[in-house]
Amino acid sequence: MRKFDKSIAAFEEAQDLMPGGVNSPVRAFKSVGMNPLFMERGKGSKVYDIDGNEYIDYVLSWGPLIHGHANDRVVEALKAVAERGTSFGAPTEIENKLAKLVIERVPSIEIVRMVNSGTEATMSALRLARGYTGRNKILKFIGCYHGHGDSLLIKAGSGVATLGLPDSPGVPEGVAKNTITVAYNDLESVKYAFEQFGDDIACVIVEPVAGNMGVVPPQPGFLEGLREVTEQNGALLIFDEVMTGFRVAYNCGQGYYGVTPDLTCLGKVIGGGLPVGAYGGKAEIMRQVAPSGPIYQAGTLSGNPLAMAAGYETLVQLTPESYVEFERKAEMLEAGLRKAAEKHGIPHHINRAGSMIGIFFTDEPVINYDAAKSSNLQFFAAYYREMVEQGVFLPPSQFEGLFLSTAHSDADIEATIAAAEIAMSKLKA
């Protein structure tokens, strides 16, 4: 049995200092019934907690660390920038360099604005969509999480799903009434919503792969249908690629599925582990953003040199060949997890999109939030705790996916499959 005495003591102290002892709810490990692990350091595919335990890491800071922990080039870039100054409140050339890379690789983006988080990106994109179209309502999908902005924290996923809250207290009714929610992968419901409210729907916002109800890819024709119905009704299509951006493919989720939105939100990978977000799209729309247009958005640390440098060094290391290797590794892990579950007769359903993998403990195919909720949460919690004992660090929620990095080796994946085999053998009915 691993010892967690230092993590337990640190969490006891933290609970007097921060709400629930954490700065983001899912980190409290509530849904898996254990004390959170306090991490001390990471290198490559491994992380180490303050008790000295080593883990193969599939959290990767919830997705940003696509090259693993303490990537040499990212670390050197951060050192070089920090020595010259961490923030200036004035433009820097590194902003141009990262913006050029984003524009080159993301099909929908002609102009991009850097911000500080994924939430900031989605909130800003909604304001832009409303200002550009002159309409008030937005359409989102049940279980899709787009950050904690009031308009979007309605029937959301992620930590909200983990806590079992359909929405959050503090979201005014006047805000909520302008958010229309329908089931993910249900194009007919989208069409019906446009029949009812089409003249006032400014945008549809969607994750190309729903990553905060587990990993739920789009059904064939779903994204194409959203593109068609928004164009027909004069609404904008926004892809929230905070999670999928540069994660599932070289050209992001939109390149992976061949559907180009009007606006795209980015985060996670483009900051290399530092706080960052971005939103961009057609020049005609983005030129409505201040100071070139009337739609206001600003940020003290937006485009700060540290995040821009980390993001630039992260993206330049990603090539089309990187994603061929991601696919090979992800297929290997997916097949191994499936084989272990089948061997022990454990109900399961595995979804994957590129290097994002979700394993659900249910017999039901998972294509939307209702199906995701059919998972056996008690089994997941027990599985999670056993995987920790086996030295594998997974996201502590059934409703979050696993991420791979360029640092994960075949040996890491083989060890993870072996750990899952042991865990499932202990837990089988």
UniProtKB/Swiss-Prot annotation:
Residue numbers of N6-(pyridoxal phosphate)lysine PTMs: K268
Keyword Repeat attributed: no
Domain of life according to the entry: Bacteria
CDD domains: OAT_like
Pathway: Porphyrin-containing compound metabolism; protoporphyrin-IX biosynthesis; 5-aminolevulinate from L-glutamyl-tRNA(Glu): step 2/2
Keywords: Cytoplasm, Isomerase, Porphyrin biosynthesis, Pyridoxal phosphate
EC code: 5.4.3.8
MF terms (GO), sorted A to Z: glutamate-1-semialdehyde 2,1-aminomutase activity; pyridoxal phosphate binding; transaminase activity
Location in the cell: Cytoplasm
Reported cofactor(s): pyridoxal 5'-phosphate
Gene Ontology biological process terms in this record: protoporphyrinogen IX biosynthetic process
Major localization listed first in the record, in broad terms: cytoplasm
PROSITE patterns the record matches: AA_TRANSFER_CLASS_3
Cross-referenced PANTHER family: GLUTAMATE-1-SEMIALDEHYDE 2,1-AMINOMUTASE, GLUTAMATE-1-SEMIALDEHYDE 2,1-AMINOMUTASE 1, CHLOROPLASTIC-RELATED
Subunit description: Homodimer.
Entry's family note: Belongs to the class-III pyridoxal-phosphate-dependent aminotransferase family. HemL subfamily.
Annotated NCBIfam families: hemL (TIGR00713), PRK00062.1 (NF000818)
The protein's name in its UniProt record: Glutamate-1-semialdehyde 2,1-aminomutase 2
Native source organism of the sequence: Bacillus cereus (strain AH820)
Gene it is expressed from: hemL2
